[in-house]
């Protein structure tokens, strides 16, 4: 699962190549987090996590500060979260998370992505049961058993630890995110985390047949072009991954 997870993240990152899209995504998320939970990252863990992620993805400081200042000013857009589920090209399971100020527009845009690439959008719960809400950490390392032992000694609830190709992937319940991150930083000072996030991890991977690869990549690109789409979770594994 670790290798497939890392490859899945890389495939998503390729479609998210445009810097303006990355900046917009973080700007919107930071604005909503600050508006709903307070402007101080020390007292708003969601905001702190987003700021840390933005810095890791090289989002300029002025983009972060502008989003927080916008939230402080009050008014502005009233975004709400929307989630859509269905089956993408080749039969893979897909969850699309959005932030929107117009549900009808967003629903139409996301539905078109499914329909124009041979997929099917479903009702809530269609595929959500095929994913688990987890905290995931990826970093350089070889000894996954030692990492598991150290985390257990730190009283962290661990779902799995995998080691492959010089990378360690740690999976925990999403509620253990900050506890696990704190423990990892204490166990391994100066640790550089390649990935640190709360996400939806598929229970079972789904191999995409070669004849469906082009449509799958088009599907992902179309979703990435939707301004309201923030995250896309899927269980697709492309050939040679």
Curated annotation (Swiss-Prot):
Q: Which InterPro entries match?
A: Integrase-like_N (IPR017856), TACO1_YebC-like_2nd/3rd_dom (IPR048300), TACO1_YebC_N (IPR049083), Transcrip_reg_TACO1-like (IPR002876), Transcrip_reg_TACO1-like_dom3 (IPR026564), YebC-like (IPR029072)
Tell me the Gene Ontology biological-process terms attached to this UniProt entry.
Answer: regulation of DNA-templated transcription
* Keywords of the record: Cytoplasm, DNA-binding, Transcription, Transcription regulation
UniProt keyword annotation of DNA-binding present: yes
Q: What is its main location?
A: cytoplasm
Cellular location(s)? Cytoplasm
In terms of domain of life, where is this protein from?
Answer: Bacteria
PANTHER family linked to this entry: TRANSLATIONAL ACTIVATOR OF CYTOCHROME C OXIDASE 1 (PTHR12532:SF0)
- The protein's name is Probable transcriptional regulatory protein Ping_2063
What organism does the record attribute this protein to?
Psychromonas ingrahamii (strain DSM 17664 / CCUG 51855 / 37)
Q: Taxonomically, what lineage is the organism?
A: Bacteria, Pseudomonadati, Pseudomonadota, Gammaproteobacteria, Alteromonadales
């Amino acid at each position: 699962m670790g290798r497939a997870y890392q490859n899945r993240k890389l495939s998503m990152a390729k479609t998210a190549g445009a810097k303006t899209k990355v900046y917009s995504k973080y700007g919107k998320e930071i604005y909503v987090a600050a508006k709903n939970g307070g402007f101080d990252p020390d007292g708003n863990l969601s905001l702190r996590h987003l700021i840390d992620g933005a810095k890791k993805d090289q989002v300029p400081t002025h983009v972060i500060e502008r989003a927080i200042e916008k939230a402080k000013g009050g008014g502005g857009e009233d975004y709400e979260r929307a989630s859509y589920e269905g089956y993408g090209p080749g039969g893979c399971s897909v969850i699309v998370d959005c932030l929107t100020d117009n549900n009808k527009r967003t629903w139409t845009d996301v539905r078109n992505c499914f329909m124009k690439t041979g997929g099917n959008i479903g009702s809530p719960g269609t595929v959500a049961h095929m994913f688990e809400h987890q905290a995931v950490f990826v970093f350089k390392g070889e000894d996954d058993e030692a990492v598991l032992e150290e985390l257990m000694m730190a009283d962290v609830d661990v779902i799995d630890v995998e080691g492959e190709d010089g990378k360690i992937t740690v999976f925990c319940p999403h509620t253990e995110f900050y506890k696990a991150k704190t423990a990892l930083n204490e166990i391994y000072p100066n640790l550089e985390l390649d990935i640190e996030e709360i996400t939806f991890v598929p229970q079972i991977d789904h191999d995409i047949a070669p004849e469906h690869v082009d449509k799958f990549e088009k599907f992902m690109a179309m979703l990435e072009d939707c301004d309201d789409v923030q995250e896309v979770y899927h269980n697709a594994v492309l050939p040679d991954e």
